[in-house]
Amino acid sequence: MILDEIIKKTREDIIKRESEFSLDWLGRSLAFNSRAPRDVFSYLSATPEDPYRVIAEVKKASPSRGVIRENFDPIAIAQSYEIGGASAISILTEPHFFQGNLDYLAQIRRYVSIPLLRKDFIVTKYQILEALVHGADFILLIAAALSKAELKELLGYTRHLGMEALVEVHDKSDLVKAIYAGSDIIGINHRNLQTFEMNMNLSYELIPLIPNGKIIVAESGIYEHGQLEDLSKAGVDAFLVGESLMREDDEEAALKKLKFGSN
């Protein structure tokens, strides 16, 4: 299964990185970092003035699609997203399967003012501290990659550092984990990370099971304004959109069209 392969490789990478820069060393480096993470909730909460909050993704490649963007300038893409009305920016940092890089996070942080999401396969506290040091305001935690206890522990550590987590679910059992852990931002990924099959009805199936007061994010398979309208009516607050924007030459125009429609 592809998710298992990615997690295995991720753990191998963490061992190498921690041998070079320990968790304690990373923690001490925060003394030189006075930046406070942004309040993600205020950026992702839908309002009548901005009902379609978009987390626009900086992503070069994926296991299912291969290279999505040959001419890849992460800083320019992120700046276009902010101008185009993104509420936050998701940055792929996984190097082997998505051709991401942790340095993209630090580079983009210097040029945009909206919240940044470290999107990776996070399974240790070390990666969470890395995210903060490199400029993230919130991180992705994938329920399918963690036990209930692990998810709760990592979410608690994330909040201890002043950040928040987007907890991604793919089915009812994942959702049970997310609720048990106390997740306040729940992402419903229409793509199954084990099989890469899409289920665009998943948001409609899971939203009724989510307690009130949570921010709900729809992920994957979102290409047009009508989907935002329909999902918003069902209870979605924000939308994580990557490939459909990354395939456009003008990301700013593509994002505006997605948010506001053709007119």
Swiss-Prot record:
Q: What class of enzyme is it?
A: lyase
Its GO biological process terms? L-tryptophan biosynthetic process
According to UniProt, this protein's pathway is: Amino-acid biosynthesis; L-tryptophan biosynthesis; L-tryptophan from chorismate: step 4/5
* E.C. designation(s): 4.1.1.48
One GO term in the molecular function aspect is: indole-3-glycerol-phosphate synthase activity
Gene3D superfamilies reported in the protein's UniProt record: Aldolase class I
Q: Kindly give the Pfam families that the UniProt entry links to this protein.
A: IGPS
Tell me the keywords, alphabetical order.
Amino-acid biosynthesis, Aromatic amino acid biosynthesis, Decarboxylase, Lyase, Tryptophan biosynthesis
Top-rank taxon, per record: Bacteria
Give the signal peptide, or none: none
The reaction(s) this protein catalyses: 1-(2-carboxyphenylamino)-1-deoxy-D-ribulose 5-phosphate + H(+) = (1S,2R)-1-C-(indol-3-yl)glycerol 3-phosphate + CO2 + H2O
Q: What family does the database annotate?
A: Belongs to the TrpC family.
Protein name per UniProt? Indole-3-glycerol phosphate synthase
Lineage of source species? Bacteria, Pseudomonadati, Campylobacterota, Epsilonproteobacteria, Campylobacterales
Task: Please name the gene that encodes this protein.
Answer: trpC
